[in-house]
Every structure is written in structure tokens, then in C-alpha cells.
Amino acid sequence: MAQRILVLHGPNLNLLGTREPHIYGSLTLAQIDQGLAALAGQLGVALTSWQSNHEGALVERIQAAAADGTDFIIINAAAYTHTSVAIRDALAAVAIPFIEVHLSNLYKRDSFRQHSYLSDLAIGLITGLGADGYEAALRYAARH
């Protein structure tokens, strides 16, 4: 059975391609997800990508991952990275290994964006590589 990997996209990532492309790049979320789906096919893993602007919906999807056989999570919690104890607690509760991904380099941004509630629980953190960060995370997840 193929490894099951869940990619979670947080708030405002549905606006990629038009929202501050000088920070987040010009690719849309659909283009990022299409690229990940193609790579997942090459790597022989089952991939589900999911986006929500709502904290509770992200928490519920993380909780559902514990029951649906998800083996690994790749998460860009976006703004919730810096504010959400609920998402942190959900990730801790399900104990599914995860990588935290950010399109922009958090450490070159506003000081309030430089704290993550998730990083100390994550297997790893990829920040500032644009959409390539998702691909790096997927390649790692496929091997572990």
C-alpha cells in the first residue's frame, strides 16, 4: 500500500498568484497542488491536498488524518503558524510526523512572524524556498 501524505494549506493561500507575488511567488495554489500531485505519482505515494481559511476546519482535518491512514503531514499553517495553539495541540494529539513549510523566509519578515507554535513539534522546517519547499518536503516524506 502506498504511503499516504496530506498537504494542508492555511488561510489566504487560496489567493496565491495574486496576493503579494513579490513575497509569495506567482504560482497559484492549484498550480502548486498540480505539481505536487505529479511528483507524488513519480514517487509512488498517495497525496491529498486540502486548504481552509478556518482554524477549526484545519484542526478537524488534522484529527481526521489519525483515522484515515495518513502517514505524514506537510503543513503550511500560514498566519496560524504564529497564533494557533489549537493547531499545535491537534498535531501533537494525532502524533503523525509532519514538516512545516512556508513559501517566504519567516526570518526576513516582521518580528511577529518569526515565532512558530509548530516548529518544535515538526520533523523539520522549510522556509523561504517558495513552492520548491513543498516539493522538498514531499520528497522527504516519501522516503520516511
Swiss-Prot record:
<feature type="binding site">
    <location>
        <position position="113"/>
    </location>
    <ligand>
        <name>substrate</name>
    </ligand>
</feature>
<dbReference type="GO" id="GO:0003855">
    <property type="term" value="F:3-dehydroquinate dehydratase activity"/>
</dbReference>
<comment type="subunit">
    <text>Homododecamer.</text>
</comment>
<dbReference type="Pfam" id="PF01220">
    <property type="entry name" value="DHquinase_II"/>
</dbReference>
<comment type="pathway">
    <text>Metabolic intermediate biosynthesis; chorismate biosynthesis; chorismate from D-erythrose 4-phosphate and phosphoenolpyruvate: step 3/7.</text>
</comment>
<feature type="binding site">
    <location>
        <position position="76"/>
    </location>
    <ligand>
        <name>substrate</name>
    </ligand>
</feature>
<feature type="active site" description="Proton acceptor">
    <location>
        <position position="24"/>
    </location>
</feature>
<dbReference type="GO" id="GO:0009423">
    <property type="term" value="P:chorismate biosynthetic process"/>
</dbReference>
<keyword id="KW-0057">Aromatic amino acid biosynthesis</keyword>
<protein>
    <recommendedName>
        <fullName>3-dehydroquinate dehydratase</fullName>
        <ecNumber>4.2.1.10</ecNumber>
    </recommendedName>
</protein>
<comment type="similarity">
    <text>Belongs to the type-II 3-dehydroquinase family.</text>
</comment>
<dbReference type="InterPro" id="IPR001874">
    <property type="entry name" value="DHquinase_II"/>
</dbReference>
<feature type="active site" description="Proton donor">
    <location>
        <position position="102"/>
    </location>
</feature>
<comment type="function">
    <text>Catalyzes a trans-dehydration via an enolate intermediate.</text>
</comment>
<feature type="site" description="Transition state stabilizer">
    <location>
        <position position="19"/>
    </location>
</feature>
<dbReference type="InterPro" id="IPR036441">
    <property type="entry name" value="DHquinase_II_sf"/>
</dbReference>
<feature type="binding site">
    <location>
        <position position="82"/>
    </location>
    <ligand>
        <name>substrate</name>
    </ligand>
</feature>
<feature type="binding site">
    <location>
        <position position="89"/>
    </location>
    <ligand>
        <name>substrate</name>
    </ligand>
</feature>
<dbReference type="GO" id="GO:0019631">
    <property type="term" value="P:quinate catabolic process"/>
</dbReference>
<feature type="binding site">
    <location>
        <begin position="103"/>
        <end position="104"/>
    </location>
    <ligand>
        <name>substrate</name>
    </ligand>
</feature>
<keyword id="KW-0456">Lyase</keyword>
<keyword id="KW-0028">Amino-acid biosynthesis</keyword>
<dbReference type="InterPro" id="IPR018509">
    <property type="entry name" value="DHquinase_II_CS"/>
</dbReference>
<dbReference type="GO" id="GO:0008652">
    <property type="term" value="P:amino acid biosynthetic process"/>
</dbReference>
<dbReference type="GO" id="GO:0009073">
    <property type="term" value="P:aromatic amino acid family biosynthetic process"/>
</dbReference>
